[in-house]
């Protein structure tokens, strides 16, 4: 009898001990047994929060029955996530540069990272507080945008291409070239990407020029073509591209491969092409802005994003390729080979071209958009903000140079 009672007590103790982990796993949908709960539980019940500023549609939010990554982080760590979106690298940069808000995590692309490093806008995380950094394939580390790998942790990689409707564009040869975006055969059925970096990069590639501007003269050549394009396009788009392409409202649009995967899943008539002239290959990274006062919390968030289960959820939800070796091992062969090496052979990275040329491109992009009154009201506030940010950046660079000379 005593042995039976003792056995029941031991069994009850085991249930009680396992209950918190089991309950937490049920709430978050994540296998907490694979997590270092001592590491993630350091700030539980402190009432802390972090502010994350990410591009739209760029995280698994549980909308399609997958893992809600931010909710899982909150429940595992006790740290509240204040999450907001931006539409382009440039709008994110302008908001941070003008002091519009303070964020603890941002997710810029490679060329923007190098710009933000040069202008002192990022702080160095303590990489020893991000043990999952070991999961990142070394070929994505120590790249030209962050050669010492002190400021950024790779999140995704991808490529810019053309998403098109096969019912409207029946000949694949049409979208084998960026020239499709100037085709009068698709008048009012062409969407153009609404950011200066990609718009000029596409045009440079079509002209057979380097995708990174090397002179004002190169920019001017692209401006001529971009102004000519206005007569055939339906609209300039950012996240609006999803509704328009999924809804069959346009024949084609330049956009990113991961987002193309999402759109194709909702409309099987859509397909994706990487034009033969080449395109932009990019890496987006998790970074900590200089103004953040919550570095250790941000490091924990970054580490959580590198957990295999979290990384897999993000990859499946957003469709972008992963630099995380542990996640890559879990993917099927079709996903691993998309995009294929042959298509990427002529692609390259954007680089930071300096404050003077960057400001010149921004001004010329505004000139392209405002050449049509239809877009003037929309773009002028954005342009003025970009100009203010650009002038501030230029003055900082000049002041730094002067100080060095002294």
Set out the residue ranges of the language-model regions.
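A ligand-binding cleft/hinge motif common to bilobed small-molecule-binding domains
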Residues: 112-115, 252-269
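Hydrophobic core
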Residues: 10-18
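Extracytoplasmic ligand-binding site segments that recognize negatively charged/polar headgroups
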Residues: 51-66, 87, 101-249
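Early extracytoplasmic/lumenal segment of secretory-pathway proteins
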Residues: 25-115
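Sec-dependent signal peptide cleavage junction
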Residues: 18-30, 398-401
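Conserved C-terminal helix/tail region of periplasmic/extracytoplasmic solute-binding proteins
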Residues: 345-406
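Mature extracytoplasmic/periplasmic domains
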Residues: 280, 284, 289-347, 387, ...
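Periplasmic-binding protein-like
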Residues: 135, 219-228, 266-290
């Amino acid at each position: 009898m005593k042995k039976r009672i003792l056995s029941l007590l031991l069994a009850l103790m085991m249930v009680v001990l396992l209950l918190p982990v089991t309950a937490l796993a049920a709430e978050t949908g994540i296998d907490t047994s694979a997590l270092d709960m001592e590491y993630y539980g350091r700030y539980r019940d402190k009432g802390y929060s972090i502010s994350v500023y990410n591009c739209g549609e760029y995280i698994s939010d549980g909308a399609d029955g997958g893992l809600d990554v931010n909710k899982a982080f909150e429940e595992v760590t006790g740290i509240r996530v204040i999450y907001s979106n931006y539409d382009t690298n440039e709008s994110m940069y302008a908001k941070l540069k003008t002091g519009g808000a303070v964020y603890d995590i941002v997710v810029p692309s490679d060329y923007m990272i190098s710009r933000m490093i040069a202008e002192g806008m990022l702080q160095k995380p303590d990489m020893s507080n991000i043990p999952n950094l070991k999961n990142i394939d070394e070929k994505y580390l120590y790249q030209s945008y962050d050669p010492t790998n002190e400021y950024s942790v790779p999140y995704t990689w991808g490529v810019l291409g053309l998403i098109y409707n096969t019912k409207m564009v029946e000949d694949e040869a049409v979208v084998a070239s960026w020239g499709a975006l100037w085709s009068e055969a698709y008048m009012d059925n062409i969407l153009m990407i609404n950011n200066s970096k990609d718009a000029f990069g596409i045009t440079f590639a079509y002209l057979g020029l380097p995708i990174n501007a090397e002179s004002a003269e190169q920019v001017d050549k692209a401006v001529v073509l971009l102004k000519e394009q206005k007569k055939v396009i339906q609209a300039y788009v950012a996240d609006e591209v999803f509704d328009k392409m999924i809804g069959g409202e346009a024949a084609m649009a330049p956009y990113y491969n991961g987002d193309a995967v999402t759109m194709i899943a909702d409309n099987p008539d859509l397909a994706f092409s990487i034009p033969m002239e080449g395109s932009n290959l990019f890496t987006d990274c998790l970074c900590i802005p200089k103004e953040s006062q919550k570095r250790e919390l941000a490091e924990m968030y970054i580490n959580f994003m590198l957990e295999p289960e979290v990384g897999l959820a993000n990859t499946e939800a957003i469709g972008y390729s992963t630099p995380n070796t542990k996640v890559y091992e879990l993917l099927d062969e079709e996903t691993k080979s998309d995009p294929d090496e042959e298509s990427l052979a002529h692609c390259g990275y954007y680089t930071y071209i300096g404050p003077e040329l960057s400001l010149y491109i921004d001004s010329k992009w505004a000139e392209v958009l405002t050449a049509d009154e239809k877009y003037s009201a929309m773009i002028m506030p954005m342009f003025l903000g970009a100009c203010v940010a650009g002038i501030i950046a230029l003055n900082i660079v000049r002041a730094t140079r002067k100080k060095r000379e002294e």
